[in-house]
Amino acid sequence: MRRTYHTILKERFHRRLWYERIRLDWTQAEMAEQLHMDERSYSDLDTGKSCCSAVTLVLFLVYVCEDVALFLEELRNAFEAGTENAA
């Protein structure tokens, strides 16, 4: 079950991260700077190759995400749908 949560978070975070970067018209380097990470690590997040750390998630929610409540609601809904399918 924990793997399901990790997979869902990875996919949802990747999508929202990309969306917010495009919305803000930022390069990967600019987004990496906002999230206090190197460009290579950011690129892995932006392409969905890796999942975010707790610190990166918090920095994203505090400094980048336009609608935190909406993102968290979408994430909760995805978790609920994903765990129902896994059961």
PLM segments and residue spans:
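Short, charged recognition helix plus adjacent turn
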Residues: 2, 7, 70-87
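A short, Lys/Arg-rich alpha-helix, primarily the initiator
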Residues: 1-23
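Residues in the recognition helix of alpha-helical DNA-binding motifs
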Residues: 20, 34-35, 45, 74
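Short alpha-helical DNA-recognition segment
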Residues: 25-44
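Residues that mark the N-terminal boundary/hinge immediately upstream of a DNA-recognition element
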Residues: 16, 27, 53-56
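DNA major-groove recognition helix of helix-turn-helix/homeodomain DNA-binding modules
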Residues: 53-71
